[in-house]
Amino acid sequence: MSIKLVNIGFGNIVSANRIVAIVSPESAPIKRIVTEGRDRGMLIDATYGRRTRAVVITDSDHVILSAVQPETVKQRLHTDSSEDDEEIN
């Protein structure tokens, strides 16, 4: 099993195998998840002071804030996995 990485903006990279969800930060439940993650010490702010546009939730209960749109992260994740498939074939 190889480690797949995805860029979440500004040179920050997350293991794609650990990502559970990539969501928009506007809804109240997601804001609550971010607050709880901050309280537990499981929040990683990768926005470099910019506006949070995506919240990445991992299987280890880490909450990662990104300044990149969720759709952009999804495309990067999909592009990376497509390139891996092409290398195998």
Curated annotation (Swiss-Prot):
Xref: InterPro entries: RemA-like
Name of this chain's protein: Putative regulatory protein Nther_1328
Pfam families reported for this sequence: RemA-like
Family, per entry: Belongs to the RemA family.
Species for this entry: Natranaerobius thermophilus (strain ATCC BAA-1301 / DSM 18059 / JW/NM-WN-LF)
Matching HAMAP family: RemA (MF_01503)
UniProt xrefs under NCBIfam families: MtxBflmRegRemA (NF046064), PRK04323.1 (NF003315)
